[in-house]
């Protein structure tokens, strides 16, 4: 799947500074692109626009030539946020969080494989988000984003809040999954070392 952002501009309301100013970005099928910029330069805002969560003031995002805002049903562009507790319903059990993604795999072993790869424990699935650690919750959010029809993953500081061992485990699995499924990725991080390791190229805003 090819994703193209054309001439994206955005600011939060009148009288505020321009967050994004005529940004262009293309991600080819199966390509991994890193995004770097200082804090406050619109990295997360751009990610939300690319995933269809925000509407730009001008410009457009195309997914295989179709505007992302016109897509219906499951969006092939899925985003994992830095703070997992802000992206889940606290009143829903974690098994339901998984079901929010496109988890209708024809072969049940696919779901089990992703659970195992991310270290998701069965005994956690009946719990609520507040009953697990941040690292455990982020594993569920990543699994949710890796639905059957996901073709591009946006990882916005996906492992920043996790310890180094957990970061390594998660990135090891995600990179293997991207290669296995020929998925693309946009990764946001303040760490140039991480982006150089996990991406094909790095873009600075």
Locate each region found by the language model.
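Hydrophobic anchor residue at the start of the ABC signature
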Residues: 142, 154, 170
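Helix-to-loop junction immediately C-terminal to a conserved catalytic motif
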Residues: 51
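H-loop/switch region of ABC-family ATPase nucleotide-binding domains
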Residues: 188-190
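ABC ATPase NBD coupling module
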Residues: 66-78, 86, 92
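Conserved ABC ATPase signature
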Residues: 128-132, 136
């Amino acid at each position: 799947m090819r994703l193209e952002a054309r001439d994206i501009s955005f600011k939060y309301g009148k009288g505020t500074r321009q967050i994004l100013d005529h940004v262009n970005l293309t991600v080819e099928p199966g390509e991994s692109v890193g995004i770097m910029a200082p804090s406050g330069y619109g990295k997360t805002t751009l990610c939300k626009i690319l995933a269809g969560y925000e509407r730009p003031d001008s410009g457009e995002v195309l997914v295989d030539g179709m505007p992302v805002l016109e897509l219906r049903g499951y969006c092939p562009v899925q985003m994992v946020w830095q703070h997992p507790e802000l992206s889940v319903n606290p009143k829903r059990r974690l098994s339901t969080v998984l079901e929010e993604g496109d988890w209708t795999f024809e072969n049940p072993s696919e779901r089990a494989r992703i659970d195992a790869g991310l270290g998701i424990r069965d005994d956690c699935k009946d719990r609520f988000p507040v009953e697990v650690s941040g690292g455990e919750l982020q594993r569920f959010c990543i699994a949710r984003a890796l639905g059957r029809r996901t073709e591009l993953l946006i990882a916005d500081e996906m492992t920043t809040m996790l310890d180094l061992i957990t970061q390594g485990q998660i990135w090891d699995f995600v990179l293997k999954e991207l290669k296995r499924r020929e998925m693309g990725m946009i990764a946001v991080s303040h760490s140039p070392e991480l982006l150089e390791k996990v991406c094909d190229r790095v873009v600075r805003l």
